[in-house]
Structure formats: structure tokens, C-alpha cells
Amino acid sequence: MAKVIHGKGIARLRKEMESIKNARLEVGFFDTAVYPSGVPVAYVASIHEFGWGPIPARPFMRPAMNAQRATWQRNFLSGFKAVANGQVTTKQVLDQMGMKISAQIKESISSVTSPALQESTVDARLRKLTAGVAATAKGSIAKPLVATGQMLNSVDYKVTA
């Protein structure tokens, strides 16, 4: 049997349903994330995702999306049902999903192992390491995508609700 909502409950429900309509969750690399050289992390991430010239594609975003899409859809659906039932707010659902999705993208970045780095890239990393520049946030010096950890640590989310 359907539950009838009266008074303040209906006003709250209308407000939350309106906020769902206007809500937005963005996950990825934002303008504030830049390398010390000033190069946007999003630019470097897109080169790694799709490849460019001599740099082979090392996709991490699309594999994460493909692997998690059904789970994300189920989680959004159950979250918005909880909003409709008055258990949580739209912003809470989107914040929770943003944290989860950004963590899964970071995991995807960390799991990339191929194509292997060129020997010249590994040599350049070793030179930087011996010159005192921070290198290797996770894994070995020869692991793709995680030399400094900047890209990995720049995955973030924004909620507009």
C-alpha cells in the first residue's frame, strides 16, 4: 500500500525531487589540477587515455566506466529511492557516488601495466630520481601512469545539487 505524505513531508519531498532534476555529478580532472610546469592534468590524462603520436593509449577511464557502469546505475537508483523515501538528500547520494567513482577511477589508473614504458622513459625517470625529483608514487619506476602520483591524486569529483 502506498504511503500518503502530508504537510511538511510533501514539501520536503517536492524540494528533493526538484533537486534531483537539477543535480549534477562530475568526476574526473578539473581545471585546478595542474603539474608544477603549469600543464593541466586533464590534458596529460587525455593523452594517456587515447594515445597521441609516439605515446600509446593506456586507457583507464573507459575501462573503469565499462566495468562499473551497471553497478553505478544500481547505486544511483537505490540512492534516489532513498531520497524519495526521505532517508537522505540528493547531495548526500551524489557525494557518496562521487567518492566511490573517483576511487574506482584511481584504482583503474593504478592497475594499468601495459603497454610497457619505453626504455628511454624509464631512464628519464631514473635520472629525475637521482637528481632528487620525487618519483614513483606507487609501484616501480617502470610502471605506467604513476611516476609522481599527480594524475592519480588529481582524480576528483564535484557535486552541484
PLM segments and residue spans:
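Short, Lys/Arg-rich flexible segments
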Residues: M1-A161
